[in-house]
Amino acid sequence: MLNIEQIKEIIPHRYPFLLVDQVLEVEEGKRAVGIKNVSANEEFFNGHFPEYAVMPGVLIVEALAQVGAIAILKKEENRGRLAFFGGIDHCRFKKQVRPGDQLRLEVELTRVRGPIGKGKAVATVDGEIVCEAEITFALGEKKE
């Protein structure tokens, strides 16, 4: 299990764009399972939507991508690198995510060749799928 400080040692995201609160499981280079506690205080709820708060789907996908990045960047040879979002395929949103929900974010890396990889990503709330997608990423170096 990884807490928020340990997550911040692996990926560069910070508030308000760090969308993973904890990691429950990680198999380096293979898969990871994370949690995002969706609070009524999230900044994005101010505009999406003021009268009926719904977490934007693109942020659910971004949260999944961050969990996938943790899975690949936890691997020893990738430490200190960056994982860039490369693409989304077959993305479907099945249910709304509202304040008070706990998102369970699961990403299984299905193919990694050189600096390019793909993963099967599934987000659930209370065991029900809210989003699923195939995500593509590219590993890169930090440039000073």
Swiss-Prot record:
The active site is at H48. Its main location: cytoplasm. InterPro entries: FabA_FabZ (IPR013114), FabZ (IPR010084), HotDog_dom_sf (IPR029069). Its EC number is 4.2.1.59. Disulfide bonds: none annotated. It catalyses: a (3R)-hydroxyacyl-[ACP] = a (2E)-enoyl-[ACP] + H2O. It holds the Pfam family FabA. One of its GO terms (biological process) is lipid A biosynthetic process. The keyword Lipid metabolism applies. It is an enzyme of class 4 (lyase). It is found in: Cytoplasm. GO terms for cellular component: cytoplasm; membrane. Keywords: Cytoplasm, Lipid A biosynthesis, Lipid biosynthesis, Lipid metabolism, Lyase. Belongs to the thioester dehydratase family. FabZ subfamily. Involved in unsaturated fatty acids biosynthesis. Catalyzes the dehydration of short chain beta-hydroxyacyl-ACPs and long chain saturated and unsaturated beta-hydroxyacyl-ACPs. This is 3-hydroxyacyl-[acyl-carrier-protein] dehydratase FabZ. It comes from Bacillus cytotoxicus (strain DSM 22905 / CIP 110041 / 391-98 / NVH 391-98). The lineage of its organism: Bacteria, Bacillati, Bacillota, Bacilli, Bacillales.
